[in-house]
């Protein structure tokens, strides 16, 4: 993030989600509620997994890291957005904007790869249950999580470095946070090379991880169909479909944002897609991945009884 640039802009104005004053307070209250639920859900999940030894397994190790990623990348975006709802001047400095972009990309890339690791973990658990403890050793689990964060840090550094090379002559970002495509529209220099590089990098991340998830779930589905018990098959389908819905929502919204030309959709469409993967998905992930799980409910019940008595 030290690339030289000749931009005349020293600060940006964030356009926000809407220009209608009467909607500012309702939206503030809505997103404040979403953010509180996101923080409580993800912090609660991390704490619950840490306090209960029966949840110290690869599956919950990955879930706790997913909760950490969700908590972090929601916190990169939402607090500033909440301030802007009640502020007269929605300003962010050039350094602050690029820092927000960098950390957002770190965690959104990490989310892609964490979902992939979790899909692989479920594949091993369902398709190779006898080898699960051997394959998913503590050393491999730690290595996979370290790889996820390393890819996020490196990928974000490359993409943010590309954005730092652009010259910005306009200061109004038609978005509610500093994202790649809205920033490109403010550049007075050619963005073709940067846009192609970002398209390739984002495409690689999304396509490679989503294909890995799809292949893992294809094998999982094949194994589920071989379950003789209707009750067991129904339970497995229910869990698998919930996970797959969350993955599809995340990849669908990110692909809509990044795997297209920067002029291919309206501002409203871009905002809706962004809201899904920056605020809604981090709120729903603890519910979809964890709180519907009987082991988590049992651990929560034991923890609450331990505190009461």
From Swiss-Prot:
Residues 1-28, 78-90, 155-195, 260-270 are extracellular. One of its GO terms (cellular component) is plasma membrane. The chain crosses the membrane at residues 29-49, 57-77, 91-111, 134-154, 196-216, 239-259, 271-291. Belongs to the G-protein coupled receptor 1 family. GO terms for biological process: G protein-coupled receptor signaling pathway; sensory perception of smell. Gene3D superfamilies: Rhodopsin 7-helix transmembrane proteins. GO terms for molecular function: G protein-coupled receptor activity; olfactory receptor activity. It is found in: Cell membrane. It is a multi-pass membrane protein. Pfam families: 7tm_4. Odorant receptor. This is Olfactory receptor 8A1.
């Amino acid at each position: 993030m030290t690339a030289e640039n000749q931009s005349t802009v020293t600060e940006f104005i964030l356009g926000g989600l809407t220009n209608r004053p009467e909607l500012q307070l309702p939206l503030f209250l809505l997103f404040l509620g979403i953010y509180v639920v996101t923080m409580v859900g993800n912090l609660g999940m991390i704490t619950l997994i840490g306090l209960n030894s029966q949840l110290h397994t690869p599956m919950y190790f990955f879930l706790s890291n997913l909760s950490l990623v969700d908590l972090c990348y929601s916190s990169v975006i939402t607090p500033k957005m909440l301030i802007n709802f009640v502020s007269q001047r929605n300003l962010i400095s050039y350094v602050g904007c690029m820092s927000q972009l960098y950390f957002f990309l770190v965690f959104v890339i990490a989310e892609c790869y964490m979902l992939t690791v979790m899909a692989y973990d479920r594949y091993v658990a369902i398709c190779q249950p006898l080898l699960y403890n051997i394959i998913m050793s503590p050393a491999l689990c730690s290595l996979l999580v370290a790889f996820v964060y390393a890819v996020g840090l490196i990928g974000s550094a490359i993409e943010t470095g590309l954005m730092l090379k652009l010259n910005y002559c306009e200061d109004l970002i038609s978005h509610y946070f500093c994202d790649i495509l809205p920033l490109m529209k403010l550049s007075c220099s050619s963005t073709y090379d940067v846009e192609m590089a970002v398209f390739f990098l984002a495409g690689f991340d999304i396509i490679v991880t989503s294909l890995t998830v799809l292949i893992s779930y294809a094998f999982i589905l094949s194994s589920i169909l071989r379950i003789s018990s209707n009750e067991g098959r129904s339970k497995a389908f229910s869990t698998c479909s919930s996970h797959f819905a969350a993955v599809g929502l995340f990849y669908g919204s990110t692909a809509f944002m990044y795997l297209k030309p920067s002029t291919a959709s309206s501002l409203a469409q871009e905002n809706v897609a962004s809201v899904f993967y920056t605020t809604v998905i981090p709120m729903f992930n603890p519910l979809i991945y964890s709180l519907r799980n009987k082991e988590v409910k049992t651990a929560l019940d034991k923890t609450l009884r331990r505190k009461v008595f």
